[in-house]
Amino acid sequence: MSEELLQKEVSVPSISMMEQDAIGEVLNISMGSSATAVSSLLDRQVNISTPSVSVREFHTLDYSAMEPALIVKIEYVEGISGNNVMVFRQRDIQIILNLLMGNDDPPSDDFEFDELSMSAACEVMNQMMGAAATALSEFLNRVVNISTPTASIVTSEDSYRDAIGVQEGDEIVAVSF
């Protein structure tokens, strides 16, 4: 599965390689917990790859392979500030939803999100991000709480920008797994 996690860093225009490595390590720990949570939900082994961290202007990201996609965004409401945005290809979310329903069918080209599938996807992401927040809490030795996830379907760079809440020229820390 292809997924990309974006974290907007408003006050820090650039970060050092050591800071990028630290972000990658922390996210590897927290996303490892997320993968475990999804493994439990799906009753399947879920693995994540080693994260790749970069600082870039939002408009330089190429989302063409991710369209259409589901974006799930959470905000940190306690312990740390910022937000996380997970971007999933529609095909990957369909696989997750099929497995949740005990269905091993391959993804369908005519799949469209409806209210039920969006709600189910948000609940899966809530479980993932809740597990990640718990791992961050343990790592940082402080309480880390998140908002309820919000989800958006995106089909273009403009809809990505609107869903994530960035402006033209904003720098983000992009982490790909």
Give residue ranges: language-model regions.
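Composition-driven recognition of glycine/serine/threonine/acidic- and proline-rich low-complexity segments
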Residues: 2-177
